Amino acid sequence: MELYPGVSPVGLLLLLLLGQGPSQIHGSSGENTLAWQSQQVFWTLKNFPFPCKPKKLELSVLSESVHSLRPSDIKLVAAIGNPEIPLAPGSGTINMEKPQSIKNQPQDVCMGIMTVLSDIIRHFSPSVLMPTCSPGKGTAVHTTAEDLWIQAKELVRRLKDNPQLDFEKDWKLITVFFSNTSQCHLCPSAQQKSHLMRHMEMLWGVLDYLHHEVPRAFVNLVDLSEVLAMDLQHQETGFSPAPEVCKCTETTTLSKAVMQWSYQEAWEDLLASSKFNKHETFAVVFQPFFDEIEPPLKRSSPQDPTTLALRIWNSMMEPVGQKDGLLNTAERKTMKCPSEESPYLFTYKNSNYQARRLKPITKLQMKEGSEFTCPDKNPSNSIPTTVHSLRPADIKIIGALGDSLTAGNGAGASPWNILDVLTEYRGLSWSVGGDETIKTVTTLPNILREFNPSLKGFSVGTGKESTSRASFNQAVAGAKSDGLAGQARKLVDLMKADKTINFQEDWKIITVFIGGNDLCASCSNSTRFSPQNFIDNIKNALDILHAEVPRAFVNMAMVMEITPLRELFNEPTVSCPRNILSRLCPCVLGLGDNSEELSSLVQRNRDYQKKTEELINSGRYDTRDNFTVVVQPLFENVSMPRTPEGVPDKSFFAPDCFHFNAKTHARSAIALWKNMLEPVGHKTRHNNFEIKAPIVCPNQASPFLSTTKNSNLGNGTWMVCEERAPSASPPTSVHTLRPADIQVVAALGDSLTAGNGISSQEGNLTDVSTQYRGLSYSAGGDKTLENVTTLPNILRKFNGNLTGYSVGTGDSSSANAFLNQAVPGAKAENLTSQVRTLVQKMKSDNRVNFNRDWKVITVMIGASDLCDFCTDSNHYSAANFFDHLQNALDILHKEVPRALVNLVDFINPSIIREVFLKNPDKCPVNQSSVLCNCVLTPRKDSYELARLEAFTKSYQSSMLQLVESGRYDTREDFSVVLQPFLLNTKLPVLENGKPDTSFFAPDCIHLNQKFHTQLARALWANMLEPLGKKTDTLDPKGHISLACPTKDQPFLRTFRNSNYKYPTKPAIENWGSDFLCTEKSPSSQVPTSVHELRPADIKVVAAMGDFLTTATGARPSGYKRLATPWRGLSWSIGGDGKLETHTTLPNILKKFNPSITGFSTGTLDNKAGLNVAEEGARAQDMPAQAKTLVKKMKSTPTINLQEDWKLITLLIGNNDLCLYCENPEDNSTKEYVKYIQQALDILYEELPRVFINVVEVMELAGLHHVQGGKCAMPLAVQKNCSCLRHSQNLTAMQELKKLNWNLQSGISELSYWHRYMEREDFAVTVQPFFRNTFIPLNEREGLDLTFFSEDCFYFSDRGHAEMAIALWNNMLEPVGWKTSSNNFIYNRTKLKCPSPERPFLYTLRNSQLLPDKAEEPSNALYWAVPVAAIGGLAVGILGVMLWRTVKPVQQEEEEEDTLPNTSVTQDAVSEKRLKAGN
């Protein structure tokens, strides 16, 4: 055997010098081998989807060059060398089919791999022949490399003898398996080197033989060392010799990863330059098989043949130089395909591979110095005795503990010299290196040497921790936290033994940084690397330092946020040795982007950080004056540096793309130094290393290194923001508003904003009534930011001329309050009053330039509403809350120029409840019903408490809905932004689990200054966070660093400068309602009086009317079927589905009495139930409908006519209005009322126990007046409502309106008719919700046609749902106080509820508009009430007319009280006055 002349043994020795151990080439023993032909085993892919499209890649001409060889050109697949992987069917990712007789022989495994590979190629080349694995001739159980020669010769013979193969012309794919099982990478012995040389020469000879003998061949050289080594971890294979004992004193993950990479590179370079790749008909390509990049516990081991075959195939599809050989689970299941651009198998030539020796390896100057400009470099006048008055110049000794980032691995390596990552450049280490000076190398020691040139302990040059150059840098490359205590022990011993220092007297700085390697390995052993074990290891090390080292300031550098490393790894345009990266940190880089494992890792990272802070903040290391540990969070939030093109910038990393280079060490040193000078609690936690920051200097007012004790700012905050400049010129857009542009600050809200009890001392309950407005989080301006943290004090750091803030104490009318117009106890309904006062003050105060000054207004409301919601859940409904808030914001939007409005969530009442009830010794529990009844008094797990939670969520949802409607984003100089930091507030608790009352005022309800400080910081942070990424949690005990604007993002964030699109509202699937009522029980006995009738007493429902009650057109059905009556959806009588999906009166009543009967379902006549309405019915048809209804009731066997209470709803008049113009004389009001009266008389005479709703006819003319051309079928309107043909005729429409009002007026008297009051079991109640019918508008202020059918005439199912809600709510409102307008704003919680105090359906008598029966005077009273009501109706109608007429003209002068959605009309006021007068 000869080597190729151009490759000497010296070339192979390169592999040895790179650290490779002996290579074992294993052949087949020949024993127990299946006969090659007769016992051929056929392996197949089962149920595996083939993703490639071979036809697109086909060529009619066979390739003449191996460098353009396509899979379709291959005729035969073969292999020599045995992979020796034990079979494990089912262990891989793809199922195999094989006969049961197959045994675990090496030959079998080889055939399995080749068969699968052949099956893949068969999709491209159907004529591919059956694969072959050449058997060896040896007889030993473990054969030597010579057997590979036997297999190679046997293979060549078989290929030549194969009659189906054209040996000279057909292309062959040959795989050569070999393995190097020695794991000794760094220090092979002389014997091992000799052994390896001999075997590699043999392997080279085999390749030379194939090159000489086999034309047209593509040879894969496959090293299965890694696969075999992994299998040996699980079981002894019986086919491979055990690895030789490694004589190295130590090996690390880093060294193994680097040497494995070097091994691959050496093969690549050797083969690329060899004769094997110089010709057109032959090529040898090294196919690396490294470990998978996934947690060891998830690996499928041993590997099955199918997986190995896929890995060979996929490697052939990757260009040389880009073959990482690293796969996660998902990738192992994926078959790669040739691309149209590169449809061939990759060789060194067609991959444009550049050998490493040709790559630039010049040593680049990576060091980065800094300018030092601090003027005061003096030490203390005398050596300090306390660590809390320690100046930088007092430091005499420096040391460090940690891992390879502190050891400096690769810090000085040139970009291409990956081997140099193994060099520990300790002199460049960020925290303890001392090479050169600060001008050329930036490190913490070099900064400190500017203060004290005699500093000792820093490391210089390169070397291990055991070398003298390391000095007190005892960091160990590859170290994990469980090795930290050993480092601490070693450091203490070194310091004590050093005769050049005074161990007892010299002040020391020791920096500890550990945890990255724990995180990188944590997914393989979550117990060992749990957050608790991590912090226990930290504690053990710090305990040693605390116990033994005097005069020490310890920097505990927080573990780095490690997941940004994924950005570098996943960026395809960045050239990194990904196999090294994957080995160094498999837990970070081997997980899917949205996997649970990655989420767990991110949480573990945070828990490491959190527990570190908890340990240090516990005070464990603050028991002596001469020792402290301070958390330095410079690495807590680290952004991946990026190039100007936006890709991760590898120039910040060592050649392995994992460790820091000298530039990053320098910038880390500056960040650490800055942290050391920043007060505890106000340290910079986010660093962008792209920007080279200057070296900061000690503050003359505070020249000491910051400790917990000397950083005690109380409730103040340290301003660390550098970008504080205003815009170059005053901005005209709220979306380009900088903090320094704000000139006015204001606030609205309740007692929290007013500042009640902020500074009240514990136990001084009466002082909670004091309004400490100067300390209020959103509006207070007492003292300065260093003493009092509030939003105004933060803004004053940007603009010292800020105005509007409150100071001292006082109520909203005091001069101290200024523009803080919050009022204690204020509810949402009071907000408009505050807004008007605020607007007036801003307009009239000469300190405010109303039109030019930019304003920030903070609004917080809702807590007081929840305190009282249970007293009247209808009044405090979410719908009303929404309306009140909208009305207030509407005024600001209309009246106030240049304003950014912060809408702040209220604190969840559950927090207040927990604090209050779990501290009975400190909180005034006996006064809970007075302080906040509906929050504090419900029992645990009660229905009342569940309702509180439901109302809370509804309020919060209303706020979000209002802001995200875009209603307040129509002007360039105004925006409302929801700041959600209070959405998920964490209860502050003590170590014993009790709520921490130190955050609360003496009443345990209001918040003290400690809590307000956190609110201000959180609000400010929210203002700088983009929409969609705002923090929606608050931990009062957590650290909230002061957020800062940046050069890239200098603006207060709005929807536009956040590039945020309000989410499209999901399609509403149904128009159901949520049922929140608790009072659902019937009367204890069946009532005999209609005036004591509860909803649950109702047994029968019925209805009379026209197309509205038949629900004609409620669902789309096309033009020809427009007249379909959807009775099951009818507002007053439909019973389809359930309340949660279909809001109808019967479905509401079913919640009180599930056995109710009479309702309609579906569309068929026989399912109409007691719905006797007819589509075209008019008033004249009501007597006939009444007779029909009576007959039906009497004939229905399930109805007990005498005993069952019946609810009948009558609505008629729409057709009368639509057709009156055809014969005005026959459509008089008198006739209309007469027919209804006749119908009621029939019911009165025939039916016992009846409650009748008579619904006033809707204001039809107004409803259909301004629809323009938006109707899909306007002709249908004209056909069904001929009077509307004249909608453009003002006189005709006035006549229609007049009749409309007269019909409403006439029917409104029915509630007061004496005839219907004579029976105790009969009542008629007029329900007036349609009296003032307003056209529903959509969010764009256009007509909302979703309330109507396709022809815009009938009501849709949505319209029916809203009618049902309005009717039900009218039934629960006293006569004289009923809502007389429709509110069709969608809300699932608009249904009112009976209460224990008012459980009945309202009649005239139980509305207390009449005296008791015993005192009843003459009938005159019954007529006095309706007369007053009619007069009030006229006033109401005139008001509506005036509003509709004047609104378009006087829109700019419209006041908030003109909004009529939920107003009570004038007739109610008149009736109330009449009652009072009588």
Curated annotation (Swiss-Prot):
Active site (UniProt): S404, D518, H659
SUPFAM superfamilies: SGNH hydrolase
Function: Calcium-independent membrane-associated phospholipase that catalyzes complete diacylation of phospholipids by hydrolyzing both sn-1 and sn-2 fatty acyl chains attached to the glycerol backbone (phospholipase B activity). Has dual phospholipase and lysophospholipase activities toward diacylphospholipids. Preferentially cleaves sn-2 ester bonds over sn-1 bonds. Acts as a lipase toward glycerolipid substrates. Hydrolyzes fatty acyl chains of diacylglycerols with preference for the sn-2 position and of triacylglycerols with not positional selectivity.
Glycosylated residues in this chain: N180, N525, N626, N637, N715, N764, N787, N801, N830, N926, N1227, N1280, N1289, N1387
Protein name per UniProt: Phospholipase B1, membrane-associated
InterPro entries: GDSL (IPR001087), Lipase_GDSL_AS (IPR008265), Phospholipase_B (IPR035547), PLB1 (IPR038885), SGNH_hydro_sf (IPR036514)
Membrane topology, as annotated: Single-pass type I membrane protein
EC number of the protein: 3.1.1.5, 3.1.1.4, 3.1.1.3
Main location: membrane
Keywords: Cell membrane, Glycoprotein, Hydrolase, Lipid metabolism, Membrane, Phospholipid metabolism, Repeat, Signal, Transmembrane, Transmembrane helix
Composition bias, Basic and acidic residues: 1469-1478
Modified how: Undergoes proteolytic cleavage in the ileum.
Family: Belongs to the 'GDSL' lipolytic enzyme family. Phospholipase B1 subfamily.
Organism phylogeny: Eukaryota, Metazoa, Chordata, Craniata, Vertebrata
Single annotated GO MF: lysophospholipase activity
CDD domains the UniProt entry points to: Phospholipase_B_like
Extracellular side: 28-1422
Region entry Disordered, spans: 1451-1478
Recorded superkingdom: Eukaryota
Organism: Mus musculus (Mouse)
Gene Ontology cellular component list: apical plasma membrane; brush border membrane
